[in-house]
A protein has these predicted regions:
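Catalytic-domain carbohydrate-binding cleft regions of carbohydrate-active enzymes
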Residues: 1-406, 452-455
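Accessory, solvent-exposed terminal regions and/or long lumenal/extracellular loops of proteins
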Residues: 407-503
């Protein structure tokens, strides 16, 4: 927490950023996108953000950052239509400037000695380069209503991008600039939106120390499901965000399990850029996918509060079990079997809990993987209850779960309060009734966060904390109460209805 706060606090995304994202195939046209949005609506699937992949550029690899006139003949009209339908647009880009871009001649003096994919590499450490590029982005994207970016191929862990011998006008060594590049691009683009008093939310391939304050979520082309969970968990130790995005699956079971995981992550996204998959690609689990996607929308008040705690207090919204109070299970050491070739020194292997995590203050998520019929879940100290039923699950112990339905194991701590919106495929700026769930038999308190959901006015004090409390008398009777501060505005909630899940 102190590290996150030292670097400016965690990012508070716009409320729409916590909805469901869908990245469309790279060569989609404006009409293709509209049909895709229509199909989401027809099938009752939530959709908040459409991601456009490289084909929106007139040329990509390297990029022009200008619209392809054949696929998007009226980009301003298209962007407005999407906004009118409560759909934000997020644009893919990489840093490398095409000679066919109108910005090419302006940026050329502020680029490196070597190209990448024959594209010029802007020196984003220089204010002059940042201004030239962001002026171009404003003209062709931001001023049209584009809500954010997916910034690819700026992960400079080796010389795959540009060689160590490359030089840049700032004088920063090539190796250092590779490692700074993702952070510098985040800084430059966030500044554009701050100037408009609009929050953005997007994806980035790389970051470095101190980028937790930027509203970008890390991703890459890796696709092992278990590895994705490990990355999601480990990100919390360094104050950054990670998404285990869904792209494709071999079976409907794997499809469902990946979707269930991503809907409890910082960005709930299906990335169909290459193969055109849809949430309903596997018909036998379509209803289950719809259910978890709608639950994602229901959880937005809870998730938004978790991100507010990230911004104000430094608490990661998704975090490793080691960061949960009362969690004390030590890593187990298993002796390796002596083998003259494979293990000549009988090396030991440490088994750690890296397949379950906390979301927000009260929720524990234990994903399932394709082929699993049961799994072990480590419950921290105190009593824990099933999210879906409210039934007692265990107390400070390791339990074995055999799912009776298609849900993944999700638990809530004793006294935990979970605020939920209605299940809806679209949401806007209006107020919605809130279902306030309470689990277990202990009294509970929860500080629900609210603001306008889109601007930086919360930094000036324009936000509200609603105190949700549940008391339990001597006979075990529960009573819920919501206290709104006098004189404070409420943006998102019209009423508070308490539901006691554990009777």
């Amino acid at each position: 927490r102190r590290y996150n706060l030292y670097n400016g606090g965690g990012a508070l995304p716009p409320r729409w950023g916590l909805g469901f994202w869908h990245r469309t195939p790279t060569l989609f046209t404006d009409n293709d996108v509209k049909k895709e949005v229509d199909e989401f609506e027809k099938r009752g699937f939530p959709l908040s953000v459409i991601g456009l992949e490289p084909g929106w550029h007139s040329k990509a690899y390297p990029c022009t950052y200008e619209w392809d006139k054949t696929r998007f003949p009226d980009a301003p009209g298209f962007a407005k239509e999407m906004l009118d339908r409560n759909i934000r647009l997020n644009l893919w880009m990489n840093p490398y400037v095409s000679k066919h871009s109108e910005v090419y001649d302006k940026i050329k003096p502020y680029t490196g000695s070597h190209t990448v994919w024959l594209g010029e590499v802007p020196d984003y450490s220089m204010p002059e380069a940042c201004k030239i590029m962001t002026d171009h982005f404003r003209k062709h994207q931001v001023d049209l209503g584009i809500s954010g970016y997916k910034m690819d191929e700026n992960d400079g862990y080796d010389s795959w991008l540009w060689p160590d011998v490359a030089t840049f006008p700032s004088g920063i060594p090539a190796e250092q600039l590779r490692n700074l590049y993702g952070s510098l691009m985040q800084q430059a683009t966030v500044k554009m939106y701050r100037e408009k008093n609009l929050r953005t939310y997007g994806q980035v391939r790389a970051g470095n120390a101190g980028t937790n304050a930027y509203p970008y979520v890390l991703y890459n082309d890796y696709y092992d499901h278990r590895g994705f969970i490990t990355a999601l968990i480990n990100s919390s130790f360094i104050g950054v965000l990670w998404t285990p995005e869904v792209r494709s699956s071999k079976t409907s079971e794997e499809w469902l399990r990946r979707m269930q995981t991503v809907c409890f992550s910082p960005i709930a996204q299906l990335n169909a850029w290459a193969d055109g998959t849809k949430p309903w690609t596997f018909a036998d689990v379509e209803d289950d996918i719809r259910e978890i996607a709608l639950l994602r929308i229901q959880l937005i008040p809870y998730l938004y509060t978790a991100f507010a705690d990230y911004a104000f207090y430094g608490t990661p919204p998704v975090r490793a079990m080691n960061l949960e109070e009362g969690y004390s299970v030590e890593a187990q050491t298993e002796e390796g079997k002596l083998d003259a070739t494979e293990n000549p020194y009988a090396m030991a292997v440490r088994r750690e809990v890296k397949d379950q995590f906390m979301v927000g203050e009260n929720i524990l998520v234990a994903p399932l993987f394709a082929g699993e019929k049961e799994r072990k879940v480590v419950l921290p100290q105190g009593k824990w209850y099933d999210f879906y039923t409210g039934k007692f699950a265990g107390e400070g112990e390791v339990i074995t779960v055999i799912p009776a339905d298609r849900h993944i194991p999700v638990y809530v701590k004793d006294g935990g309060i979970i605020p939920l919106w209605p299940a809806m495929s679209k949401f806007g700026d209006q107020k919605y009734p809130l279902e306030v769930r309470h689990y277990g038999n202990k009294p509970g308190t929860y500080s629900l966060y609210d603001d306008d959901g889109s601007s930086y006015n919360y930094e000036k004090g324009e936000f509200t904390r609603i105190d949700l409390t549940v008391t339990v008398d001597k006979k075990g009777k529960k009573k819920g109460k919501a206290v709104q501060p006098k004189g404070k505005k409420i943006w998102s909630f019209s009423e508070y209805n308490f539901k006691f899940m554990t009777e």
